[in-house]
Amino acid sequence: MLQTTLKYRNRCNICVREYKCCIGSFMSRFGLSNMALTHYLTSIIHSFTSLAHQMLKRTNQDLPTPVKYYNPEIAKEYKKIEAAAEQKLLSMLPEEFQEDFRPFVISQQTSEEEAQIVKQADSICAYLKCLEELSAGNHEFALAKKRLDITLAERKTPEMDYFLNTFAPSFELSLDEIS
C-alpha cells in the first residue's frame, strides 16, 4: 500500500483519497502547515507511527516535557488523555483501515523498537527547533537545548549520529548563510 500511496502527492498518504478523508481533513482543519516540518522530519524515520504521534500532539496540545513529567500523577493522567485520543483518532479512520492501522495509532500496540524510534525523532525535532531559535538569537531555548543534549546522548544510535552530524548543522545557519 505504501508504494501505491507515494505516487499520489495531492492525496492523503493513508487512504489515497484527495484530502477528503478523515485524516486529510483532520490535518487540514488543525493546521497542516504548522505541523508539516515536524511531521516530515519524524516521518523520515517511520511514517505511520510518527503521523499518529504528531496528530495526537496536535489534538491534545502537547504539554512541554518539564511540565508533563514534573509530577508522576500529571504524567499518568496525561497518558490516559493520550490513550483516549488514540482511540478517537483510530475511530475516525474508515472501518476497513482500522485493524491495519491499529498498531501505528494505539501506542500500547506499537513495538518497543518503533516507540523508541518515535521518541528519538521527537527529540531530534525538539533539538532542531532549539538550534533554529538559538541561531535567531532567542536564548530562552538554551536550557532546553542543554536538556536535549542529555536526552539525545541517552538515546544515541548510529542513525541518530548520522542525522545530527549530516543535517543538524544546517539548522544553525542564518538566512544570509543559506542564500
UniProtKB/Swiss-Prot annotation:
HAMAP family: 5DNU. This is 5'-deoxynucleotidase VV1_0013. A divalent metal cation binds at H53, D122. One of its GO terms (molecular function) is metal ion binding. It is found in: Cytoplasm. Its main location: cytoplasm. Its EC number is 3.1.3.89. SUPFAM superfamilies: HD-domain/PDEase-like. Gene3D superfamilies: Hypothetical protein af1432. Signal peptide: none annotated. Belongs to the 5DNU family. It comes from Vibrio vulnificus (strain CMCP6). Substrate binds at D62, L63, P64, T65, D122. It comes from the Bacteria. Its cofactor is a divalent metal cation. It is an enzyme of class 3 (hydrolase). NCBIfam families: PRK03826.1. GO terms for cellular component: cytoplasm. Catalyzes the strictly specific dephosphorylation of 2'-deoxyribonucleoside 5'-monophosphates. Homodimer.
